[in-house]
Amino acid sequence: MLRSTSTVTLLSGGAARTPGAPSRRANVCRLRLTVPPESPVPEQCEKKIERKEQLLDLSNGEPTRKLPQGVVYGVVRRSDQNQQKEMVVYGWSTSQLKEEMNYIKDVRATLEKVRKRMYGDYDEMRQKIRQLTQELSVSHAQQEYLENHIQTQSSALDRFNAMNSALASDSIGLQKTLVDVTLENSNIKDQIRNLQQTYEASMDKLREKQRQLEVAQVENQLLKMKVESSQEANAEVMREMTKKLYSQYEEKLQEEQRKHSAEKEALLEETNSFLKAIEEANKKMQAAEISLEEKDQRIGELDRLIERMEKERHQLQLQLLEHETEMSGELTDSDKERYQQLEEASASLRERIRHLDDMVHCQQKKVKQMVEEIESLKKKLQQKQLLILQLLEKISFLEGENNELQSRLDYLTETQAKTEVETREIGVGCDLLPSQTGRTREIVMPSRNYTPYTRVLELTMKKTLT
């Protein structure tokens, strides 16, 4: 028989607790089994003893009670100095075990994250350093290439800036001339409108005078009828006096009518000649405007041609720079043919660039010639303006003569009214000239279907942008 001593210690949840003791020790059930060293206890016996001791519920003479449900026990073996083996049984609740397992999982996850972050950041830093070194080497090479390219392009840009400044100054001169021409044309149009209005007013006045003469002729016929019907004693004396007065008045009236008709015909001829001159001036102005339009279109075509030449020259310069960069590298025996081909291509490109420069110079000369032609057209327009001013002066003189004739007609009508009141037997008859109202001509006004100032502004903006 084996001798063994066992001690069961059960700590219940209702026992008194010290204020500093943890709450986890309340659910610990300790079971000590002391086995002598001479006779080792087999494992099966130990398991049976553990099972039996789990069923025990004694603690220092306390009455038996059932252990709480959902408790997990753990057995710990240890050996004392007296070579006695002891087994300690610990009991935990499932909620405590779950909390500890979750705590352990959280600790492991945080440790794994820290490890990945430390080693991952180190690898990323190494990769970034490598990329930065590569980018620095590439940027140094690009910087050297760009410095060479900038040096070549700066000289070309200086030349093109000089050309652009010259073209801009020429375009500004063209703008000024075109603005002056438009202002002069607008002034001429206003003057022609005023002339037409004055001519129409004078024709209206002439029609009114003719109507008044017709009314006077009707009144004279009525007076004749009255004279014939009168049967007074002094008819003969009065007839003689009236005949004398009538003859005198008729002579004066005929003279005034002849003068009036002659002056009227002269005025009509002069106005017709002035209208013809104005029409010719308008035609010449239209021709000048058409020529200005053609010059404007030609200048636009030349600007587009220069833009295309500049683009082609830029492309050729880029090709030449590419060939020069290829030629500047180290040469081997296999690259000699390629080097010769590049030299020939670069020589042809230089020749084409020189040819394009010559073409641009020729186009600039053409633009200057067109500017000179526009200046000559401006001088011609000034001459036409002087001619129109002279015609306006003549028309004002004719208006004065017309006013003078009107005053004479007014005087004659007043004297005619006085004689009618005094005698009441005088009849006046006159044959009026046919009215020439249908001889009015329509003045063709010059018109322009475009705005040259805006066109020149567009061309200058294109030049500045290129």
From Swiss-Prot:
Statement: the UniProt record of this protein carries the keyword Cell membrane: yes
Additional free-text comment from the UniProt record: The adjacent MYZAP and POLR2M genes are part of a complex transcription unit. The respective transcripts derive from different promoters and are alternatively spliced. In human, some transcripts of the upstream promoter of MYZAP use exons of the downstream POLR2M gene.
Primary subcellular site in the record, as a coarse category: cytoplasm
Source lineage: Eukaryota, Metazoa, Chordata, Craniata, Vertebrata
Signal sequence range: 1-20
Record region (Disordered): 1-23
Record keywords: Cardiomyopathy, Cell junction, Cell membrane, Coiled coil, Cytoplasm, Cytoskeleton, Disease variant, Membrane, Signal
Polar residues bias (residue ranges): 1-10
Tissue: Detected in heart, liver, skeletal muscle, placenta, small intestine, lung, prostate and testis. Expressed in arrector pili muscle (at protein level).
Protein name (database record): Myocardial zonula adherens protein
GO biological process terms on file: intracellular signal transduction
